Amino acid sequence: MDASGAATMAVLSSLLVFLALSSSLCSAGTLNARPAFPVQSGEIQPSGQNSKQAARRVMHPSFANAGRTPGLEIWRIENFEPVIYPKTNYGKFYTGDSFIVLNTIENKKDKKLSWDVHFWLGLETSTDEAGAAAILTVQLDDLLNGGPVQHREVQDHESQLFLSYFKNGIRYEQGGVGTGFKHVETNAQGETRLFQVKGKRNVRVRQVNLSVSSMNTGDCFILDAGSDIYVYVGSQAKRVEKLKAISAANQIRDQDHNGRARVQIVDDFSTDADKQHFFDVLGSGSADQVPDESTADEDSAFERTDAAAVSLYKVSDASGKLKVDIIGQKPLTQAMLDTRECFILDTGSGIFVWVGKGATQKEKTDAMAKAQEFLRTKKYPAWTQIHRIVEGSESAPFKQYFDTWRDAGMSHSRLIRSALGIGSDELLNDDEIDSVVTQLKKSGGRAFGFMPDHGQNVIETITQYVAKPGSDEIVVSTVPFDEKLPLLGFASYVLTYNYEANNGDTGSLTYVWHGVKASAAARKRAFEEGLVGSKDGLLVQTNQGHEPRHFYKIFKGKLLTSFTALPVTAQLFRIRGTVESDVHASEVAADSSSLASSDAFVLHSGKSHKIYIWNGLGASAFEKQAAVDRFSDYWDDVELEQVEEGAEPDEFWEELNGEGQYDRSLGDDGAPLLESRLFHCHLSSGGFLKVEEVAQYEQEDLDSDDIMLLDAGDEIYLWVGYGVSEEENGKLLDTAKLYFNLEPTARSFDTVSIIRVPQGKEPRVFKRMFPNWDDNYWQNQPSYEDMKQLVIDANNEV
């Protein structure tokens, strides 16, 4: 070993403790909400030249221009040194190597840069190379002044963020600089290789045994025979999988054969002779011997488990000795986090390490070590993800575990723009928006981002579904819209409405509304008929007390929901609203515990012809007046009396079972307003829901073959692609229910609105939650037949 190599090994030995810690840091994967580091495009601002940090900073020459411009940069570790990886090989990773991947993003508005740096470890990489990758990643992070988010990636367990960088997928090749294997030589003849293509949006291409037993009818396979590359399309493979397999084969042709190989596609349209030729080249089997679609259901998905076991631990060295103490379990609140400390959040399927800005250096350094100890104690797999979160840059996946969350200013740009009708090119005034959002969340209705229009049109039809007492027989009747006729809490309703947005966006909208006491049979019948009747329009299911703001708007401020058709005892209604058109009155239990100081209430006496307007100390002047306007002539021959909180007459309390405890807080935090997130959800063959988040999602991530779930907090959008079957479409609610059984927030299936959006019928509010939207996107995408023709054209040029 030369002097340089010996010196390198000495450094590695001295950093053995660091290596032990860094080797356990699993990739974050879903950290798609963080502030950009304040550096202008093309500029890296070093620390002061006299600082101790600057004095100890070391920069490898290969990193000299790293992170200066947007885009992807990759280095392969060779003899413990970072070597720039050719762009033509991006996406190809060797099982015996380690790599460093840097992704630089430029904010389109202020031109500031932010970074994600990943070190990728092949399953056969050496310990020394893995250590060098970890150390060099820290060096690269230091060069960028600590700005990057760091991720550790392990072969077969990469984060969705990492996979998203490689649109043609990533391919695992045997070999490596530090192993006994040899990298495949370009255009090598005689070495036949079989690859399995797994996944759809984010694809992994794995080399498998050269045998028909390695195949199945549900996937696509690539057979690289040197001058010919065959794409075998499984009979059960979907359209997107076919397109991705062709793209992966083209990449193998270009990377491994300098574009000089021919790509041959073998599918259901191929002749029997062409199919058999494929298996002759493979060396075994026939089309009839290909195993059925795999039941392992391993297509690049993760399953959320044990959400109820979420726990928060504090990492402290206040006593001079580092210790970890549990401080809370679900429900968690933001107030539990102390800026002077470090915390570990155990979600049951991953670990977050939250570092407060005022934490000691020892706590910051040792927090990850304690997380590693925690993994061993819990006997979690070695590749379990660990996410390191710094105060102020919390991601949506982290914030979802807390019942309430308040950011300093608004970082939820997609949701806020959608809710308030702010264009993507308009700047946000945080103070003004904070005030509007707070008021909307309290009084303007749930899902205030869902506003297809302003509710100015009339409701077309209202159909009521009521179960006969003592049976599941459903009485269906059409009811007129009348401001004195309430929606009844023991019934379900289907309402139809045609929306017209100011931008010309039009469409049909069907609401399925369930009262809190509606029978299961009534709910089922109403949804089934609403689903059939809505055809290609929007379909929204919502529950009493959790209606979207738009639902209130179509009632023009006259919505009243009641438990009973005719009052026989005292009735208590809560009045909320922000403007005349969204005022709504909701019946609550006639008990003093139902009162809240932040609201106005109307009590209809069961003992006298009197209506009490109760004004809570925190109720807005608008809501107090709205209560008077709404109920002054609602009942005939009644006396109206206004009562201020704290000055109630005895007869008022008698109607409410006596004066008792109630919510006297003047604020209403409500559910956290989280950044919207996109998921692909599907049921496995075993009946389990598989959930795959799409990191930094775009319109192109919506898969026409599937149902995509866009979680926007109070509303869940179920986007239904063109290729979804009638059977799958009929199981929309099952998908949503299972999703809520697994996701960790305090929300439930009954407290959110479920919105079905057919492909091609997306309303403006849905489109605004994407960075960019092109109405002609899918029409301009190449079909499977188009891709096959392009392959033929390319073959003719070889």
Swiss-Prot record:
Q: Write the record's keywords in alphabetical order, separated by commas.
A: Actin-binding, Calcium, Cytoplasm, Cytoskeleton, Metal-binding, Phosphoprotein, Repeat, Secreted, Signal
Region annotated Actin-actin interfilament contact point, chain positions: 128-131
Q: Where is the signal peptide?
A: 1-28
List, alphabetically, the InterPro entries matched.
ADF-H/Gelsolin-like_dom_sf, Gelsolin-like_dom, Villin/Gelsolin
Chain positions covered by the region annotation Actin-severing: 57-181
**Membrane-spanning intervals of the chain:** none
Does the keyword section mention Secreted? yes
SUPFAM superfamilies reported in the protein's UniProt record: Actin depolymerizing proteins
Record-linked Gene3D superfamilies: Severin
Is the keyword Cytoplasm in the record? yes
Alphabetical GO biological process terms: actin filament polymerization; actin filament severing; actin polymerization or depolymerization; barbed-end actin filament capping
Q: What residue ranges carry the coiled-coil annotation?
A: none
Q: Which residues bind Ca(2+) 2?
A: D705, D706, E728
* Residues recorded as bearing Phosphotyrosine in the entry: Y90, Y612, Y662
Where does the entry say this protein is expressed, by tissue?
Isoform 1 and isoform 2 are ubiquitously expressed in early embryo. Isoform 1 is expressed in the fat body, and is abundant in hemolymph. Isoform 2 is expressed in parts of the gut.
> Pfam families recorded for this chain?
Gelsolin
Example GO CC term: the record gives: cytoplasm
Q: Describe its partners and assembly state.
A: Binds to actin and to fibronectin.
What role does this protein play? Calcium-regulated, actin-modulating protein that binds to the plus (or barbed) ends of actin monomers or filaments, preventing monomer exchange (end-blocking or capping). It can promote the assembly of monomers into filaments (nucleation) as well as sever filaments already formed.
Tell me which family the UniProt entry assigns to this protein: Belongs to the villin/gelsolin family.
- Protein name stated in the entry: Gelsolin
Q: What's the source species' lineage?
A: Eukaryota, Metazoa, Ecdysozoa, Arthropoda, Hexapoda
